[in-house]
């Protein structure tokens, strides 16, 4: 039931932004799932929310489009998100990452621009694979490390891709490769 709720939210967000002509890219767990699905649908991991990359300048247009779709803009602990008007829950909403801005104060790299998006097989815009991997390595929380392992498990991370990562992110990838699934599942 939770998976279908997230899929409906993802589709609602993508359809509203596409219809309004707002540039965006799905990031986070749904982006990982979209890429993993291109190789092995059975290896897809569920996620509880939707993360979407937007340009800050596009936020008013995005907010209007999402409001028409039944999602209301909120700010929770400094995070911009869109929540279901009937059942607002920050844990299960659509969370915004702003393109070109640091996700956290200590982040070494800013979030990418939405121009890094490609159309997924499911029809929504998703951040390009190398950019997604860099974002996951930048964040480097436990779930991000698990997502990197998911991408490795279906051979979506190769040496050519790793070689193009910044040194600090390549070191994090090597750490995950050296200790797969130890305390991260």
Where are these regions (language model features)?
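Compositionally biased terminal segments of proteins
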Residues: 1-185
């Amino acid at each position: 039931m939770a998976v279908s709720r997230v899929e409906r939210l993802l589709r609602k967000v993508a359809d509203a932004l596409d219809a309004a002509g707002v540039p965006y890219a799905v990031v986070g767990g749904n982006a990982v799932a979209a890429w993993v699905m291109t190789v092995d649908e059975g290896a897809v991991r569920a996620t509880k929310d939707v993360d979407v990359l937007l340009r800050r300048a596009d936020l008013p247009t995005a907010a209007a489009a999402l409001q028409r779709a039944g999602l209301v803009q909120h700010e929770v602990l400094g995070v911009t998100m869109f929540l279901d008007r009937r059942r607002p829950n920050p844990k299960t909403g659509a969370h915004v990452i702003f393109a070109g801005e640091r996700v956290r104060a200590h982040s070494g790299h800013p979030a990418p621009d939405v121009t890094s998006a490609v159309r997924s097989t499911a029809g929504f815009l998703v951040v390009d694979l190398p950019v997604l991997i860099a974002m996951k390595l930048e964040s480097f929380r436990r779930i991000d490390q698990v997502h990197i392992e998911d991408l490795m498990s279906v051979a979506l991370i190769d040496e050519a891709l790793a070689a193009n990562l910044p040194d600090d992110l390549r070191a994090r990838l090597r750490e995950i490769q050296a200790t797969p699934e130890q305390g991260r599942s």
